[in-house]
Amino acid sequence: NVETWSNVSAILQKGAQWYASYGTEKSKGTKNFSLVGKVVRTGLIEVPMGITLREIVYDIGGGIPGNKRLKGVQTGGPLGGFIPASLMDLPVDYESLAEAGSIMGSGGMVVMDEDTCMVDVARYFLSFTQSESCGKCVMCRLGTKQMLDILENICNGRGRLEDIDLLLELSEAVKDGSLCALGGTAPNPVLTTIRYFRDEYEEHIKRHHCRAAVCPGLVTAPCSHICPAGIDVPRYIRFIADGKPAEALAVIREKIPFPAVCGLVCFHPCEAKCRRGQLDEAIAIRMLKGY
């Protein structure tokens, strides 16, 4: 590919030993990545093989903006896999990525924070793969469509627990029954999200809960969805804005018999999901409760 050709002139000028001095024993040289997503500094980077994901995300990328929690990194483009935050010390080379369930692929690297739903993002990448299938292989053509339908059902609150095992079974069938690399790697986003984030799948199915509050079939208002008490936060705020504190208090009492206690112990997770925060600052819900 183009990246290989770009290395040829440097190798001819400086020699193979110079190029092999970078990287690991089995993965020599450097690699270009497109670093994007929830990271302070995005852009094209060139790093030696064997550098860790942590070094890329924090030393080069500057970390996660807004003091958010890192959830994982997806490598290899739409056909790659997801690597959780617990594996950020993983060396970036062909062997280590393959062992973790991902690929080097096209050099894409997407950083994801706590506001990313791993079920939804697996659905997103699989929708691309399914649309790109040429249709020659039956398992790729029909298998990815069946997997996409299952993921859409889960994201819309219609999933079943047995769907998780069915996704794993279909993933292996698509990999084994496809002739080209697209079908062979298409299930990677699904396989790795189930491998590392299975609890999110189970939350979607059992509790109809999306912890990132992004799946439209499960979430009406992100602030209410993330509230441990399930309070109708927008209605509560509207009553306060209209000068009706008694009615606002009644909204809390619909879920909690002791609203004063709620005001004292609430750690206001709704503020982290407040859509107003995307414009300027989140509404200070805890201060409103104090009022």
Language-model segments: what does each one mean?
Residues 1-215:
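Redox cofactor-anchoring modules in respiratory/redox and cofactor-processing assemblies
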Residues 134-140, 180, 210, 215, ...:
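Short cysteine clusters
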Residues 225, 229-234, 238-291:
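Glycine/serine-rich phosphate-binding loop and adjoining beta1-alpha1 elements at the start
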